[in-house]
Structure formats: C-alpha cells, structure tokens
Amino acid sequence: MPLNFKPGDLVFAKMKGYPHWPARIDDVKDGAVKPPPNKYPIFFYGTHETAFLAPKDLFPYEKCKDKYGKPNKRKGFNEGLWEIQNNPQASYSLPPASVSSSDSDVPEEKSTARSDGEEEQETGQAILPTAGVSSSDEEGSDKGGVKRKGRTTTPPSAKRTKHSSSEQEPDSASSSEEENSDSDQDFTPEKSTPRIQRRTTNLGKKNKIFAESDSKSDESEDEKKEEEQKKSPSSSSASSPSLSSSDSEAPVKKTPRGRRPAEKPAPKPRGRGRKAEPIPSSDSSDSDSSVDRISEWKKRDEERRRELEERRKKEQEEQLRRLREEEREEEERKKREKAEKGDKSDSDSDSSKSEVIAPPKPKKSSSSSDSEEDKKPVKEVKPVASEIKKGKKEKVRAISDDSDSDKKVKKTIKKTRPSESARKTNQKEKRGERPRGRPSKVEKEKKKPEVITARKVVKKEPTVEEKLQKLHSEIKFALKVDNPDIQKCLDALEELGGLQVTSQILQKNTDVVATLKKIRRYKANQSVMDKAAEVYSRIKARILGPKLESQQKTVQKVNTAEKDPEEEKQTGKVEEDMDASVNGDFLSQRIETAGDKEQDGEGQNLDNKTEMETKQNNHAEHNSNPTEETIECRLISSENQTS
C-alpha cells in the first residue's frame, strides 16, 4: 500500500531509467506551481532537481536505507547519499561552497550541477536528476545512462530570483553575452562537433579549464578583428569580462553549456577553424553571428543561381542559332533542288516575270552570291505574290540574324554533323517532299481524281445473282401499265441474256423465269416479246447444253417448212414443258399458262379452247411415240439429279 508522506520526509524516489534516488518531499510555497492530485513535490539530493511523483514510486529512507543506500557510479548519486545524511535541509538557494567544504573531490561537479539545474528551471526545459544529463561532458563518461523524463513543472519563482541574484550578480552581463555568443554558433560546421565531444570526454577538469582559457584568448582575438572591421560592440564588451574572469568563474560559464548541451563545444572549434582558414575576413564572419552566415550563404546561392541562369540562357541561344542555321541550309538546298528541276522542266520562262521579281533580290544582305544565282530560276517559276511574301520574310530573318562571325562559328559547329544532314536530304529526295508552303492548285486538281479512282476500285463488284435481281426489278418497273419504258426494258433484257446464269441461281430466283415467260406474250410491243423469247432460249441453251440446241434446230426447220400456227403452239408447249422441268413441277406450270390465257381477253376464249385440245392431242401423241420432248425431259431430270 502506498504511504502518506509529509513535507520534509526523506525518501528514495524511483524514476524510469534511474536507481532509487535519495530525495526529500518538498513543501509547496505560495505562488509556486501546485502539484497534480495524488502526487508529491520531490527534491533530489546531489543534483538539486525537482519533480512530481506518485506515492507508489516513493520509499521511506530509514526502512530502505540498507536496500537502496549503496554507492552507485551515477554522477550525483554518491553526493546525494552524503547530502541526505549530513545536510538534509539542502536546497538550490545554498551557495556552492557549503557543499564543497566537506568533500574536496566533488566541489566543481556539484556547483556545475546546481547551476545547470537552475538554468534549466529558468528556461522551462525538462529537468534531469543527474549532472551527466545537464552537461554533455558528464554524459560521455556514462555511455549506458539514459536521460530522465522531463519534469512537468518548474520550481517556485521566488527561489529562482534569489539564487540568480546571489550567484550571477557579478557575471550577469558576461553570462548573457556568452549566451548570445553561444547562440551565434548554431551554424558551426557539423564536422567539428564530434571531434570536440571526443576530446571533452577524454579530458579531465584541468584540460577543461585550459580549453576555456584558450577559447577566451581566441574570443579576444576575434573581438579585436571585429573592432577593426567596425562590427557590433556587443562582442567587444563580452571579451573584457572573459579575460578578467578567474578560474572560479568556470562553473558560471558552464551554465549555458549545461542548458544547451549541443552548443557546449562551440568555442573550441572556433579556434581550430581559424587556424585552418587563412583569410581573416572569413574567420570574423564565421564567429560574428548566424545572421551573417545566413546572409553569406544566401549571397553565394544567389550568385550560383545567376551563373546557372546565364549558362542556361547562353545554351538556349546557341541552340536557337543552330536551329536557324539548319533551317536556312535546308531551305537553300530545297531551293537549289527546285532550281535544278525548274531548269529541266521550265527552260523557257517569261521575261516579264523575271523583270518584276528582279528588284527584291539585292535586298538580301546575308545571302551569298552563289545562293542568289541558284534562287533566280526558282523565283521565275513561282507567282509574283508568293515571291513578294518570301522577300518580306527573308528581310525579317536577315535583321534577326547575328553577325558574320557568329555564322562562321555556327558553320564550324555544323560541319561536325554532315552525315545527319546528308541523310535527311536523301530521305527527302526519296520521298519527293515539296518545300514548305501550300501546294499549288494544279497539284490539288491532280490529286482529287486519283483519290476518287482509288475509292472506286475499292468498291466490290456485284455478284451474278445480285445483277440478276437488279435487272429483274428494272424489267418490272419498265413494263408498268401506266407508263411503260420499252427501251429500258430491252436494255435490261439484253444484259440479262449476257449473264452467266447457272441452274442453281435459277432455282433460287424462279421469279425471273416466270417474268420472262409472261413477257413472251406481252402483246403491247412485239419487240419486247421477241427479245424475251430470245433471252429465254439463250438461258435454256446454256443450262441444257449443245444437245438441246441441235434438237431446237430440227424443230425450227420443221416449223419453217410447215409454217403452221399449230406447230408453233406445239413448240411453245415443248418450251413450257422444259420450263416446268427447270422450275421443278409440270402441273404448276400448266396452271400458270392457263391463268395467262384467261387474262388475254374474253374474245380469245375460243382460241384458247382449241389450243388446249391440240395440246392434249399432242401430249397423247408424245406418250404413244417418244419424240424430242421426252428426250429433253430426261436430260433435264438427269441434270437436276446431278446438281
């Protein structure tokens, strides 16, 4: 169970990372910071630091004396054991000599520890219980030590004022100036700090005092130089007390080092740095202040930036010049090529154009005589307006160009790249590139038909079946009742007769065969009837072959000899039977023929009856005696089976 303590009780206080430390429960005075609830204000012996701790971290001194009261290597621990026994009422207001009179081995360490603790309390930084934490020299000896946690509060303001008035009255000005000088050393080189720390850890007290005296002498030299350079008088005022101060003032000067452990070794590197640097002005500027160094760095950075910017500008200008030269050379080459082509193609140029174009030639100051001679035929070929525009552009370019010396330098640079330019020209010649500018109207007109022809070639040709369907629709449209177009129908029938039609295509498009049959009986125009019969016979001959042709010839001979209309009707019957075999059914074809006959008119009913009778008689005769029709039917059926 945690015990209840009163102000003045002696205890062992435990903090993380430290042994049980001899301490005293302190009394809270008026105006001081009050401790948080359930915590006590603690005063540590040996280091004279304060903190707020809970009762669980406090142990009575008398009970735990044998357990925790053993000597330890920690700085300030053995002094704390001595203080808790011989001087339990010790506080920060006591002079440093009161503690050092009893023990000759620890006088300077205690005084430095007290001053360090007081300075840390004044600055409001974290307070550490050991003297090794307050100074980097003492920390170097104890490598295994870890810093104690920072205290949450600071000691009472009354105690601070008393102690500061008692100890630092004579040296207040010097200490403040030294603090300023230490703050000026924020920008010292990083390389010097590890060397100084190593040296301080290995040196003893005498070496420290000797180093301080060296630093004082160095400071005095710096101040003299600063006076010569008319620097601020604050540094000179800091040098006079530093020279007159005795060895007893060494702990007072250590106070800012304890407060700022990282800045402690500042005076030592200044002396060494000056020896290495030969220029006195740089030494004085390094020792003046961080502001001066920052300004110097800024100036250097600005100078470097300016130099870099100037270099970049120069490089950009050179690149632009090179590009301009390359463009000029390319233009000259193109013009020369054009001139050569123009001489070959257009040898006879108009004299009037040459006279009009001649005056702008001498205005080109930068161009050489050779280039002018090469440009003359080119100008004669081009129109006047384009030449005037080019003359203006070349004037602007001539004004923007640099001197002839710059051109010579650029040409020398350009000669290093002859291979690249030669490659470019060869590629352009192969491609046949024109010079920069809009193409002429003649060339545009030439290009248009080429593109149109290419597009036409890309289009696919229609198939035979598509052509057949198209012609079929044209024939139907041409033979309308309202407005028939006989010539269009004849042209379509002629094209249809020229098509390479197969039996498979006809089987798919039976409507075409049916329309041809109907057109054969188109009584409105005899030429259409004859053309339809001719086309029909052509298609039939292609499908059935040469045997059918021979049979047709024999039939035609018989027809011409007899000239009987009945026989003509009989041949029509044969053709109808063949058509039916092509379309696949005899009965359906007969029904069609009957329907066509009914449409012819009422006046032809008697003729139709006689035709039907003759057909029946002919059919009976064919059945009794196999004639040409039976042979044709057999051939058609055999072809259908093979297909």
UniProtKB/Swiss-Prot annotation:
Residues 7-64 form the PWWP domain. Residues 194-204, 549-559 have a biased composition (Polar residues). Its main location: nucleus. Residues 107-116, 209-231, 290-353, 373-382, 417-450, 560-575, 608-622 have a biased composition (Basic and acidic residues). Residues 295-345 form a coiled coil. It is found in: Nucleus; Cytoplasm. Residues 88-450, 548-643 are annotated as: Disordered. The keyword Nucleus applies. One of its GO terms (biological process) is muscle organ development. The keyword NAD does not apply. One of its GO terms (cellular component) is cytoplasm. Residues 176-187 have a biased composition (Acidic residues). It comes from the Eukaryota. Residues 90-104, 232-249 have a biased composition (Low complexity). Pfam families: LEDGF, PWWP. Keywords: Coiled coil, Cytoplasm, DNA damage, DNA recombination, DNA repair, Myogenesis, Nucleus. May act as a regulator of myogenesis. Promotes the repair of DNA double-strand breaks (DSBs) through the homologous recombination pathway by facilitating the recruitment of the DNA endonuclease RBBP8 to the DSBs. Belongs to the HDGF family. PANTHER family: HEPATOMA-DERIVED GROWTH FACTOR-RELATED (PTHR12550), HEPATOMA-DERIVED GROWTH FACTOR-RELATED PROTEIN 2 (PTHR12550:SF18). This is Hepatoma-derived growth factor-related protein 2. It comes from Xenopus tropicalis (Western clawed frog).
